[in-house]
Amino acid sequence: PWNSLENDEFLMKLRAVAKNKNGALSPTIAGLLFFGEAYHITEILPNYFLDYREECDDKAIRWLFRIHSNEGDWSGNIYDFFCKVRTRMDDEVAVPFVNRRDGYRIDRVDVHDALEEALANALAHANYYGRRGILVVKKGKELSISNPGTIRVTKEEFYAGGNSDPRNPNILKMFGFVNVG
């Protein structure tokens, strides 16, 4: 239903912009993180940093491949980072050759969805006011995703599931609008 909205109204409903005290539209923190440029983001959140590394066992090699938000040749925002990293993670997942009944190949498996959700959750639940950034490290078949901030539910609630306390609910909503998480 939002496809017919004007851009400003769409961004307001998405919570990417809001009216400031002068009545003009300004980006929200969530909007800045999701759609902004890294150099603007770091004006507000100086420790903002997104880092994806593919490492190996050879200590002489720091990494085999790296994407980070300060490269300068892409936006450095969390949505573009998500898309770039998801592509790298997806490429490593083995997908058996199976056709659906309509003849099309199944090209995604549950592991794709789990990796996508883990990355989106790390980005949506991060404490961007913290002292460090988000780090995703792939080493062989292992993947480590860490973000600044502590978990906001009890250990029991975490393991039981179903009780979320998002640190950045508007970022979570934005991921939801692109069918992630």
Protein language model annotation of sequence segments:
Residues 1-132, 137-166, 177-181:
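Active-site helix-to-loop segments that bind/position phosphate- or nucleotide-bearing substrates
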